[in-house]
Each structure stands twice: as C-alpha cells, then as structure tokens.
C-alpha cells in the first residue's frame, strides 16, 4: 500500500541491505567520508585555470578505484569542471552516486536528482583510470542529448567523448568507439556486436572489446528488456505463412473451437476446433508426423495472432504497417518484430501485405549483451525494487542515494472500483475537478487504447488534454517537459519521455519564476495512475514524476476488480463488493481493498520473476553456444588457423593451389581459406538458429507424449550443436577441394559462397504472452 508521504530513509540493518541486493552500510559510509574529504581540495581546484585543471585530472591515479588515494581529489576536480562547463555544481549526493557506480553498484536516485551528471562523473572516473566506458541509454535521443550535454565536462577532464545513433555510419561508429566515453542506446551497441559477426576482414570490425557498461535507466535495460533478443537478419527465400490458414482460424468460435487460460496468455484448439480445421484443410490429420510440426504450428501461431494479440494494446496499425508496442515502455517500438510467423499472422489478420521475414543470421539477448562487460554499473529511479533480479542475473548490488532535498510528495491511497467503466468515469471526474484549480495533471495509462479512450472522454468533459503515446523520442521529451505547466493535462503511456524532468511551470521556467510558485502553491504536479502495474516498480516510476527536488506533488492510483493484475491473480468470488449506495459511483468502501491489490501485485511480481528465471535458463543455452561460435570465429578471423586446418586436411589440393597462385600464394591462400571457413561456420550457425526456432514452436507438444519439453529441447539443441563444428569444417573442405582456380582475386571461384544481398536488424518483441521454461546445461567443447 502506498505511503502517504515519502521521506529521507533512516538507518537500516546490514541484513536488510543484503536482502535487497544493496551494498552494506559500511561501504556507503566509506563513500560518504570520501565525498566529505573532497571539500579539502575544492579551493585548490577552484584556483586552477582550465588548462591546469585538465592536467591535474590526467595526473590522478585512478587505476585501482577501490583503493585509489586520489579519489577525493578526483571528486573535487570533477565538481569544479562540471560547474565551469555545464553550470551545474554537483551536490554531495551526486558525488556519492558517482562513487557507488565506481564501486560497481546500480544506484537508486529519485527523479530530478541529477542522474545524468552523476553518471558522467562516474564515467570520467573509469576513463581516467584507463578504462573504456560505454554509457548505455534506452534510446538514441538520450544518447545524443547526454553526450552533447556532458561532453564539455568530459573534455575539460582531458577525455574524448562520442555518441552513436541509428543514423551513424560505420566509420562514425568506429570513431565514436575509439573515444574514452561513448554514449549509445542498448539497441545500437547490440546491433554493432551482431554485424561484426559477418565481417571477413579484421579492418571491417566496428565494435571494440567490451570493458565498462554504465547503464542509464538500469532497471528498464537490465530487467524489463533483459530477455529481448536483438536480431541480425538477411534475405532468404523462406516460405511465408499460408493466408488461407490465418483466414480459417479467424472464423473459429471462442469456447467452442478454442479455449484460453484464465490469464489469456495461452490459447489452444479444442477437439471440435481440431476437427473443423482438419475438414477445412481437406481431411488431414493435424497430429500426424507430417503436419504436427508444420500445419499445426501455423494454426497455433494464427490463433495467437487472432485471439491473444489485441490491436491498440499489443500493436497499432499505421501507414499500412503493424507497429508493435513495447510493453515496458508503453510506446511504439519501431525496431521490434514478433518472431517469424507471428508477425506475418498479425499482418494477415489486419489485411496488410506480409513483410519479409528473412532468415536470422545471429541473435543475442540484451542480458547476454550486457554480461559481456567485465564491469557493469548503472543508475535509475527504481533500483531497490529490482534488487533481486539485479543480484540474481547480474551479481549487482544496489545503493540507494538519499535525495538532496527531502521528498514531500503525497501519495494517496488507491481508489478501487467494481468495474473498469466505473473507474474510468471516476478518473475523468477527478481530473476535471483538479484541472479547475489550474494544478497540472499527468495521467499514466497502460496502453495506447486506454490512453486514447481516456483522452476522448476528457475532451467530451471539457478538459483540454494532450495525449502522448506514439511519437518519436525527441517529441515525447518536448511534450513531457511541459507537463508541469499551469493547467496542463497530459495523458501518457508508462515510459513515454522517460529521462526528461518535469519542471513546475514548464521547461523554460526558473526556480524563482512566478508561474512556478503559483503551480507549487496549487500542490505541484498531480500524477494519476489508471491502474496498478504487474510490478510496484513501474507504479513508483510513475509516482516519481511528481515531487522533483523537494517540489510539492501528489499521486493517486485508480484501480478496479476488472484490471488485469487483479483478474489474473485474485479469485473474483473472494473480492469485497460493498459500495456506498448514496454515492452510486461503484467505489469499493471495504478497508481491505488496498491490501488485496498489494497481494495481487506481489503474486504478479513473483510470477514475472519465475518467468524471467525460467527463460533465462533457456537463453543461457543459446548464449553459451553463441560464445563458442564467437570464439571460433575470432580465431579464424585473426589467425592463420583456417589455412593450417585446410592445408592439413587437403595437402594435395593446397600444394596445387600454392603452385598455381605463384609468389604471394601463402597470403592469398590464407584469405581464401579464411573466407571459406567463415562462410560455412556462419551458415551452420544460421541454420542452427533456424532449427532452434522451429523446435521451440512445437516443443510443448512433447508433453503429449509424456516427455519433459525442457529436457527434450535441451537434448535436441545440444545434439544439433555438437555436429555443427564437424559439418562446417567438412563443408569447408569440400568447397576448398572443388573450387576452380581463376585469374581474378582471390585466386579461386568463391561465387557459390554468396552472403545475403542485404541485412537488417530488429528486436524480437518481448511477448507478454510468452512463458518459456527452457533449461541449459553444460556444452561440449565442439571446436576443441
């Protein structure tokens, strides 16, 4: 249940910190003493001119950050440089946050407390110690904004800074990665890693070896999007799903031909439904060996598209295209697709021409991408609530940073209603009442459909509201920045504009401005939530929009017994239904309503953690297999292993080619062998990924034969991978033996080794309906 006010945290036991995955108080106390010690050097730093300040920074000994004697001097120099270059003088709590990130923690800092500056100081500390730092953001807009904003500070400390966005060329990316500090979105860093797995010459590599990852909005990247696969795809001639099957499935009746579970996460054919589909398809047997992995899979995918995926909730249709909605950010995800057939099935369902799926050349989850870095740290407004996941999956601790000014936001108890309709009516009435006073209101909705419905009702009620749910990041930031203006009413999905402060009175209003004072007198920003999320952390992110840097503010959440989090996790028969008959608004008056909401949310959080853990075990298998492929590929790319192996396997062919190629035969043969070996390794990995995707789509059917789907998936995946190495080397030897000599470079005809004519990158949507429960065990040393 939300507290009525937020205050500065008191002393908590070391055991409590550990339970939350937080650093112990002893470490916090040491960092605090170092921050206080920086005051002894502030006058010396202030007396230095700009050139001397840069030299002083470069002379610091920060290689061993844990025991660095110069850390207090670094803090003083960084504070002085920040004030000179950005006009912002870091508070003690910002320096404390930087120190805890330098210790390898994720810090929790309230909205408006200056995470961007604290992160830049931490990045500078790592870079001055000789580390290469990637500051990882949730989108391109923030990557470029923060690099340009914090760039002068980093340059004043003698460091180089770069940024990468989707528009950056390969040369621009290489240049940015060569900088001491590089700002980039998690997507772009991941896509660069994937694209590097296609190069056949070391000179074409873009992404450097990972060193330090400093993650902004760490809970969003490390938890909400941890299991989202980033994908590199290439042109192929794979068959598209049959439109007639998708049309037939659309004619089936709920409850008669198919059933869904209580949470609407899964759908399956009934016996009657199976008979209908078999008849429509010419009397086939869906469960025969011929159709169980093909036709039945297509039907199941079409069922998911028709029944479980809802327009304006999971996706929108715009400009004759299906655009997915990112569940954790509540906004359009332009780079995301559903895997293979599901994307095409939704497009066919909406009467849109199906887009080319291509074949997956390589893939990596966000979690596996981040785990490549030897050092990971980060910052967010809601880290403690994600402490268990951060500890379990990344071995990260959490450091809560006290606010510079105590938080005086007032969080009202939930208002609970019997029906969703009654709840929406109450929300509109409440917003209209608050709007009459001029107090700005920010409304957080769960999806696009809800935000548009609420916006329409507000307009009918005479409330001029702005709806924000599907614009680009820069436009989102501009609109959100004005949500604190006098009389503003902004309806927004959960994550829209995250990373942008909401200043009372508007973005261009100073602290002493009359309009800011007027808004503060009215109570500051008022946040309205249209229902509990599946995790309290997301609720707190929304609440945290109000009460910035000691400003007044308030929040209230409206819920109903029909909300997803309640309907999926509480028995309706046990819910209190008492309402005030005089009010007639459907509001529940039972005192235990709020505690029931808390319980439903805790159950939801537990299930999400279980899904994350189970899916993580499945993804670990692919990550381990991919690591073996990457290691093998690096060896082939950077050494003469390919030439030596083919020379050993085909000595006569090698000798003949060496004679034909003349003086520079060894150099040319090294290139020829490398191209052949890399091609067949990449081809084998691509086909292996396609095999894994195929067995995943039908692995649950193993349960019909009383087999454990998880064990079966593991067995099949490991068996297939074990033969990948031998098959790739054998295919390479065959190509080497049969390739004809030519006069042109490289000396033999390799035209049959054609790579995709075009490639593209995308994210596989973090499907809220998925419930993967795969496992991973040890892998054989297939290339050893």
Swiss-Prot record:
The knockout outcome noted for this protein's gene is: Not essential, the disruption mutant is super-sensitive to azide, export of some proteins is decreased and has a small colony growth phenotype on rich agar medium. It cannot replace secA1.
Entry-linked SUPFAM superfamilies: Helical scaffold and wing domains of SecA (SSF81886), P-loop containing nucleoside triphosphate hydrolases (SSF52540), Pre-protein crosslinking domain of SecA (SSF81767)
Q: Topology versus the membrane, per the UniProt entry?
A: Peripheral membrane protein
Q: Where ATP is bound, by residue?
A: 94, 112-116, 501
**Which compartment or compartments is the protein found in?**
Cell membrane; Cytoplasm
Question: What main location does UniProt list?
Answer: membrane
Q: What's its EC?
A: 7.4.2.8
| Keywords carried by this UniProt record | ATP-binding, Cell membrane, Cytoplasm, Membrane, Nucleotide-binding, Protein transport, Translocase, Translocation, Transport
**MF term (GO), any:** ATP binding
Q: Tell whether Translocase is among the UniProt keywords.
A: yes
Q: Which reaction does it catalyse?
A: ATP + H2O + cellular proteinSide 1 = ADP + phosphate + cellular proteinSide 2
Query: Which Gene3D superfamilies does this UniProt record tie to the protein?
Result: Helical scaffold and wing domains of SecA, P-loop containing nucleotide triphosphate hydrolases, SecA, preprotein cross-linking domain
Question: Biological process (GO) annotations?
Answer: intracellular protein transmembrane transport; protein import; protein targeting; protein transport by the Sec complex
Which SMART domains would you find in this protein's record?
A: SecA_DEAD, SecA_PP_bind
Domain of life here? Bacteria
Q: How does it assemble?
A: Monomer and homodimer. Part of the essential Sec protein translocation apparatus which comprises SecA, SecYEG and auxiliary proteins SecDF. Other proteins may also be involved.
What role is this protein assigned? Part of the Sec protein translocase complex. Interacts with the SecYEG preprotein conducting channel. Has a central role in coupling the hydrolysis of ATP to the transfer of proteins into and across the cell membrane, serving as an ATP-driven molecular motor driving the stepwise translocation of polypeptide chains across the membrane.
Q: Which family does it belong to?
A: Belongs to the SecA family.
Q: What is this protein called?
A: Protein translocase subunit SecA 2
């Amino acid at each position: 249940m939300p507290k009525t006010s937020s205050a500065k945290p008191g002393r908590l036991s070391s055991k409590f910190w550990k339970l939350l995955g937080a650093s112990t108080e002893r470490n916090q106390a040491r960092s605090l003493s170092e921050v206080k010690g920086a005051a002894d050097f502030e006058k010396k730093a202030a007396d230095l001119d700009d050139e001397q300040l840069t030299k002083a920074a470069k002379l610091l000994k920060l290689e061993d950050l844990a025991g660095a004697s110069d850390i207090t001097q670094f803090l003083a120099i960084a504070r002085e440089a920040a004030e000179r270059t950005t006009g912002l003088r870091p508070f003690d709590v910002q320096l404390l946050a930087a120190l805890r990130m330098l210790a390898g923690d994720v810090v929790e800092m309230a909205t408006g407390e200056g995470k961007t500056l604290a992160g830049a100081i931490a990045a500078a500390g790592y870079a001055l110690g000789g580390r290469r730092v990637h500051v990882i953001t949730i989108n391109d807009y923030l990557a470029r904004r923060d690099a340009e904003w914090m760039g002068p500070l980093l340059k004043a400390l003698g460091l180089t800074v770069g940024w990468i966005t989707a528009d950056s060329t390969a040369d621009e990316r290489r240049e940015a990665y060569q900088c001491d500090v590089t700002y980039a979105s998690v997507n772009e860093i991941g896509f660069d890693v994937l694209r590097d797995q296609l190069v056949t010459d070391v000179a074409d590599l873009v992404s450097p070896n990972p060193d330090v990852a400093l993650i902004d909005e760490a809970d969003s990247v490390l938890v909400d999007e941890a299991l989202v696969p980033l994908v590199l795809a290439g042109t192929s001639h794979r068959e598209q799903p049959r439109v007639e099957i998708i049309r037939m499935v659309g004619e089936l009746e709920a409850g008669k031909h198919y059933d869904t579970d209580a949470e609407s996460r899964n759908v399956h054919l009934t016996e009657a439904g199976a008979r209908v589909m078999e008849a429509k398809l010419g009397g086939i047997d869906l469960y025969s060996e011929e159709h169980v992995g093909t036709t039945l899979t297509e039907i199941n995918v079409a069922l998911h598209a028709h029944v479980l995926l809802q327009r304006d909730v999971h996706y929108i249709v715009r400009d004759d295209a299906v655009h997915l909605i990112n569940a954790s950010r509540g906004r359009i995800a332009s780079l995301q697709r559903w895997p293979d057939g599901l994307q095409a099935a939704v497009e066919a369902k909406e009467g849109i021409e199906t887009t080319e799926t291509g074949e997956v050349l390589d893939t990596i989850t966000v979690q596996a991408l981040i785990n490549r870095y030897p050092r990971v740290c980060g910052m967010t407004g809601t880290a403690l609530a994600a402490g268990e996941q951060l500890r379990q999956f990344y071995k990260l601790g959490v450091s809560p940073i006290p606010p510079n000014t105590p938080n005086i936001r007032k969080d009202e108890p939930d208002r609970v209603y019997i029906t969703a309709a009654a709840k929406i009516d109450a929300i509109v009435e409440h917003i209209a009442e608050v709007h009459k006073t001029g107090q700005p209101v920010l409304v957080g909705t769960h999806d696009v459909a809800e935000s548009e419905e609420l916006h329409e009702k507000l307009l009918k009620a005479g409330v001029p509201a702005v709806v924000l749910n599907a614009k680009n990041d820069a436009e989102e930031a501009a609109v959100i920045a004005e949500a604190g203006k006098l009389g503003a009413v902004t309806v927004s999905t959960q994550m829209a504009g995250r990373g942008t402060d909401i200043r009372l009175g508007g973005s261009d209003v100073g602290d002493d401005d009359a309009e800011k004072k007027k808004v503060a007198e009215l109570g500051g920003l008022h946040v309205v939530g249209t229902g509990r999320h599946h995790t309290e952390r997301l609720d707190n992110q929304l609440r945290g929009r109000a009460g910035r840097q000691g400003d007044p503010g308030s929040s209230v959440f409206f819920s109903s017994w029909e909300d997803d989090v309640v309907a999926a996790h509480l028995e309706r028969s046990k819910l209190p239904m008492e309402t005030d008959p005089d009010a007639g608004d459907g509001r529940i008056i039972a005192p235990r309503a709020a505690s029931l909401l808390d319980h439903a949310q805790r159950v939801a959080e537990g299930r999400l953690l279980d899904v994350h853990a189970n899916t993580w075990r499945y993804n670990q298998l692919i990550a381990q297999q991919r690591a073996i492929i990457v290691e093998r590929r690096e060896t082939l790319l950077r050494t003469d292993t390919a030439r030596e192996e083919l020379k050993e396997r085909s000595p006569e062919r090698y000798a003949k080619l060496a004679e034909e190629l003349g003086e520079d035969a060894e150099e040319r043969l090294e290139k020829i062998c490398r191209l052949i070996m890399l091609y067949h390794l990449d081809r084998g990995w691509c086909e292996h990924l396609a095999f894994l995707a195929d067995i995943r789509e039908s692995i649950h059917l193993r349960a019909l034969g009383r087999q454990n789907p998880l064990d079966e998936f593991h067995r099949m995946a490991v068996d297939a991978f074990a033969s990948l190495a031998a098959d790739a080397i054998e295919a390479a030897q065959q190509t080497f033996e049969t390739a004809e000599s030519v006069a042109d470079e490289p000396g033999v005809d390799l035209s049959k080794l054609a790579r995709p004519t075009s490639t593209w990158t995308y994210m596989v949507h973090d499907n809220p309906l998925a419930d993967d429960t795969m496992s991973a065990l040890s892998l054989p040393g297939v290339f050893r």
